[in-house]
Each structure stands twice: as C-alpha cells, then as structure tokens.
Design a protein with these regions (language model features):
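Short hydrophobic alpha-helices and adjacent helix-cap/hinge residues
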Residues: 1-326
Length: 326
C-alpha cells in the first residue's frame, strides 16, 4: 500500500447507477432515505453511494424497479423532523435512517412504516427496539459501537501520546451512549495513569470554551465519543485540537481524514451496504420486528501521519501494524 497522509485509504465514491425505464412486469418499489449530514458533505456522498451500490448488487436499479427519495438533515434536528414527516407522508415501502437523530425523528412520525437504521449506538436504550435479537417494532438495523469501545479509545490515546495524563471526554449526556462510553473510559483510566474530565457537547461555542480552558493543563488529551453533535461539529473540533496542540482520538474515520490525529470505529461504508441487504429483505416480505439488530463486524483504525508529525508524536510500530491496508 502507498502510505501518504493517511494509514487507511478508504474507497472512493461509487459510480451512480444508470437510470432506466421500469419494465411492465416489474413493480416499482420506493425507498425513503433520511440522511443526517448535508448534501454537500463529501463523507455523506460516499456513504449514499455505498448504499446504492449495495442495492445494485442485490438487483435493485433506480428507475427500473426502485425509486429513492433522499432528504438531507444537515445535522439540524428541526430539519430532520420536518423531513421525517415529509417522507412518512409519501408512504414509501421502507425508510433508511442514518443516525440516532434521524431515527428518533422517524420514530416520532411513524410506528408502522419499516425503518432500517445505521449510526445508532444503543437502539435498546434509545427505545427504538425492544431487544437486539427481537426488535419487535417497525425499526431494526445496525448498531454503531459498543460501550466498551470507549476504553479502547483511551488506550489508543495513551499509546500514541504516552505523556497524556489527563483526558477530556467530549460526550452528549442526553444519549445513552454518552453515559455508557464515559463509564467504560473512567473504569480504565486509573489503571493507565489518566485522569478524566467529561465535557458535554451541545454547541461550538461551549466546546471551544471548554477545550481552551482544559488545554491550559500540561499533558492533556482529548477523546471524542459518539454523538450526532460531534459529527456535525467535527471540523471545528479538529481545528480546536490542532490550535491547542491536543492529541485526540475520535470514533469515526472521517475525523482522521479531515485532520484529526487518530480514529477507531466501525467501517461505516460496510454498514451502509449491509443496510441495503436489510432493505432488500424487507422489500421481499420480511418485517423489521423479526430482523435482529446487528453489531459492527469490522472496525477501522485510521491515523493521520501529518497531524502526528505536527504534534511531535512518533507513531508506535504496533499501531502502524494495526492500520488497515487497501
């Protein structure tokens, strides 16, 4: 593999399918998609392309046997609720939700239309499903990360920046994941000589003030736990970490791609393709109540070598060896 600024080279955008006329013998099916990110977000475009690629591999072609109506929430809760209502009003065969926030908006709108979600850390705690094995309602999908992954983030921070003795944890306390991941981090912290301080993620101004205040303490680091707010504000968070020379670990590979030091989390594109598989099964007659919620099967470690160099960090060979090569 050619190692450039990133240890992990992720696949590029997939070519969009050719639109053809529906054949008389085929029934046109309709899929609604509620994206959490904005339409001009490069990561969002790559993800929706992976989703459509997954559908194509299962025999679904836009304009021939399926129509896809995509709405872009742009990380805005009000906008997501509006588009959730609009999508539900069109009564598609199934709706694809791409984050906890969009899933919540859809669940508030409909309890009958089938929903397949990705990007939800604790669907049981959030009330979207009765259990992982038997969802029991109109929603199922693919969980994002387990709470224990929080401890892995802290381990990675300490490994890539051994001098860190104090870590601030960006989290959303309104989400079950915000509490669960923090608990896993705090349980590990004493054994590796790190003190922790949680910061609630709500808006950029609050994050900026908290990080600036925290950065005054020597040997500090940053752990960004899963939340839609962190994704929406990823570029300001990355910029703040760089301005204050804070080594930081993130839960999503797009953070490292955008300049963050290191990320560890599920292969998101793989989950989007898997979601296409569940939607295919629903379109063929299965119900979300009987399709178990699946945990991630593949995780990715991404290291931004340029950022590591700027922070004066030497990436350990053990981490380089764990980085995927494509």
């Amino acid at each position: 593999m050619r190692r450039r600024a990133f240890i992990s080279l992720l696949g590029g955008a997939v070519a969009w399918p050719v639109v053809t006329r529906a054949q008389p013998s085929e029934r046109m099916r309709r899929i609604g998609v509620l994206m959490f990110l904005a339409e001009d977000d490069p990561g969002a475009k790559t993800r929706i392309a992976a989703f459509i690629e997954g559908l194509q591999q299962l025999g679904w072609t836009i304009g021939r046997n399926v129509q896809i109506d995509i709405r872009w929430g742009a990380a805005d809760a009000v906008r997501s609720r509006k588009y959730a209502a609009e999508l539900a009003a069109t009564a598609p065969d199934v709706i694809f939700a791409t984050a906890s926030e969009t899933t919540a908006a859809l669940r508030e709108t409909t309890r009958t239309l089938p929903i397949v979600f990705v990007g939800v850390t604790d669907p049981v705690g959030a009330g979207y499903v009765a259990s992982l094995a038997r969802p029991g309602g109109n929603a199922t999908g693919f969980a994002f990360v387990e709470y224990g992954t929080g401890a892995k983030w802290l381990e990675l921070l300490k490994e890539i920046a051994p001098r860190v003795t104090r870590a601030v944890i960006l989290r959303d306390p309104t989400l079950p994941a915000g509490t669960g991941q923090l608990g896993a981090i705090q349980a590990l912290a004493p054994s590796i000589g790190v003190e922790t301080a949680p910061i609630d993620v709500r808006d950029v101004g609050e994050i900026e003030r908290a990080i600036a205040n925290f950065a005054r303490t020597p040997n500090s680091g940053l752990v960004v736990s899963t939340s839609p707010a962190a994704v929406a504000n990823r570029k300001p968070i990355i910029t703040l970490a760089a301005q204050h020379s804070l080594p930081a670990v993130y839960f999503l590979n797009t953070f490292a791609e955008d300049g963050g030091l290191i990320s560890y989390g599920p292969d998101v594109l793989s989950q989007y393709r898997q979601a296409a598989g569940y939607i295919d099964r629903i379109l063929k007659g299965e119900g979300p109540a009987d399709l178990p919620v699946q945990a991630p099967t593949k995780y990715e470690l991404v290291i931004n070598l340029k950022t590591a160099k700027a922070l004066g960090l030497e990436v350990p060979p053990t981490l380089l060896a764990l980085s995927p090569t494509r």
